[in-house]
Amino acid sequence: MNSGFFIVFLFLPEKCVRIFYIIYMYDSSFLPGNCYGRTEVCSMTLKDIADLAGVSMMTVSNVINGKTSRVSQKTRDKVNAIIEEYGYVPNLNARSLSNKKSHIIGIIISLDEKDVLRGTNYFENPYVSTMIGAIEKELQKNEYFTMIRSVSKNADIISLLKNWNVDGIIILYPAAGEYMAKLMDSATCPIATFDCELEHSNLINITSNDEKGLYLSTKYMINHGHSAIAFVADYKSSHVLANRFNGYKRALEENHITFNPDYVYEYSPSYEGGIQAGREIASNSSPVTAAVTTADICAIGIMEGARLGGYRIPVDLSVIGYDNLTLCQYTLPKLTSVSQNIPQKAKLATSLLLEKIRTGSVSSSCQAALDVEIVDRQSVISLY
């Protein structure tokens, strides 16, 4: 193959001269815009792929962006084979400029004042990490990226919306209804939340049946012969925990068990809060034989606190958690828990958010409440 080179002089203003050496291979595959089989220097364009495949640039664009309803399978395979062979990667910046989308979703974790004072790191919370992982998985499937930020002031969310170049945001632990209404009025992009108390026609909000969740766990204890059942969580701190507390009381009432406020331990539904409750149950020689709570991490703390007080789990104290996180399988004994199907919550919220970003609306309701169920393991003993 013959080859040669040219020295190209480019004269710029102010008598500035820059010299570019361009190696020109007489084989045109080395021209700028091609890869010549070397992906590390690939600068291939849609036109290059179209020329190699013998199709239009629009067809190549449709294949890359998944708009293939009018593209034959043979053409798709041919275009994809060229993309793979030459290591072509779409330029996201160029795509963003052309369709005015950043392909970035902001994930905001809203901290309350108690969390800030306690120095809570929500990224260490298994529920949060599981939820973010499930969201990121769905976004990745749709070629979206994430920006994650925790905020301690509600006003920070509005500030982030103004300064972040995001196509939409997902809020974990959303603020009270009044502030969320204000946020929705000032929002410049679609918003999705989980377990928000605000009902707004434009807000995507995915919840689970919280009241039913604690109803099921309490009834499960009752069906195994327990009547002195503790509830562990500061239920006054959020509407979600309040709903779960109502489920606990409903199960007692339906089974003619008198509610005893002494069996309510108003600790944070965290590992540390669980340890405090477990220690207290064990040290007071309480008649309590079972404990239900609103988070798996708290349930694990209850088991550890009770053990430190000399109790055996589940012989002396049966425990049921909430969330059915993977770590339930690694405790000793394995933790029985209420499943609210976190992956499904994440998938539904993400799909509705992306649909709204793409079309401006959603084909179904923005509000959805998923069902819950008990996942039986080893942390409950029958007294019968």
Where are the regions a protein language model picked out?
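Flexible loop/hinge segments that line or gate small-molecule binding clefts
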Residues: 172-213, 297, 323-335
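Amphipathic helical "hinge" segments at domain boundaries
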Residues: 30-31, 47, 89-158
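Short, well-structured alpha-helical segments in soluble
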Residues: 154-165, 274-286
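Flexible loop/turn connectors
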Residues: 279-384
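Periplasmic-binding protein-like
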Residues: 106-107, 167-172, 230-232, 264, ...
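Hydrophobic alpha-helical signal peptides and transmembrane signal-/tail-anchor segments
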Residues: 1-13, 17-25
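Hinge/beta->alpha junction and helix N-cap segments in small-molecule ligand-binding domains
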Residues: 113, 121-127, 145-156, 206-216, ...
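N-terminal helix-turn-helix DNA-binding module of bacterial transcription factors
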Residues: 16-103
